[in-house]
């Protein structure tokens, strides 16, 4: 229901951001280290790639039919990295995207993304940023960022 107005404006991807309003670690009980690393990486990615979003590491997304038909999202990772890759794909394929404010509950918070997995995820993000930049420059393409027609 809340996404209807966005799709009426022809958005291809809607992202749920925990950072669009107040700090989620204060409002929702988000662990500070999780907030801090997400915020730093999201700000870095936004500035480096000129993608106007407040959060890049969220699983809350709604895709349009146009997105599903144009983007090779099935070539993306099947873990946490998927969320980041599809945002980069939306930018790569010049699709229209926006974000809405969401909240999350961290009561009884548990995650499978421990410190070592978090570090691996961070390295994977830098790899995907590099892949995105190389593909945009037509230097090197891959199955996530294929050569455009």
Regions found by a protein language model. Name each.
Residues 8, 66-67, 123-149:
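Terminal low-complexity segments of carbohydrate-biosynthetic enzymes
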Residues 51-52, 74-78, 87-105:
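Catalytic donor-sugar/metal-binding loop of nucleotide-sugar-dependent glycosyltransferases
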Residues 1-80, 107-116, 120-126:
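Acceptor/aglycone-binding surface of glycosyltransferases and processive sugar-polymer synthases
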Residues 22-27, 48-54, 91, 97, ...:
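Low-complexity, flexible helical/coil segments
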Residues 70-71, 93-97, 116-117, 148:
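Alpha-helix boundary/capping detector
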Residues 84:
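DNA-recognition element of transcription regulators
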């Amino acid at each position: 229901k809340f996404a209807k107005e966005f799709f009426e404006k022809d958005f291809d991807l809607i992202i749920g951001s925990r950072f669009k309003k107040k700090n989620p670690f204060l409002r929702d009980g988000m662990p500070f280290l999780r907030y801090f690393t997400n915020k730093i990486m999201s700000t870095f990615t936004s500035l480096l790639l000129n993608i106007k979003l407040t959060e890049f590491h969220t699983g809350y997304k709604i895709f349009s039919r146009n997105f599903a038909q144009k983007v090779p999202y099935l070539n993306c990772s099947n873990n946490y990295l998927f969320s980041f890759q599809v945002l980069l794909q939306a930018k790569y394929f010049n699709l229209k995207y926006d974000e809405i404010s969401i909240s999350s509950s961290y009561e009884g918070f548990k995650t499978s993304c421990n410190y070592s997995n978090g570090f691996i995820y961070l390295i994977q993000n830098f790899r995907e940023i590099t892949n995105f930049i190389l593909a945009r420059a037509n230097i090197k393409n891959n199955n996530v960022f294929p050569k455009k027609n």
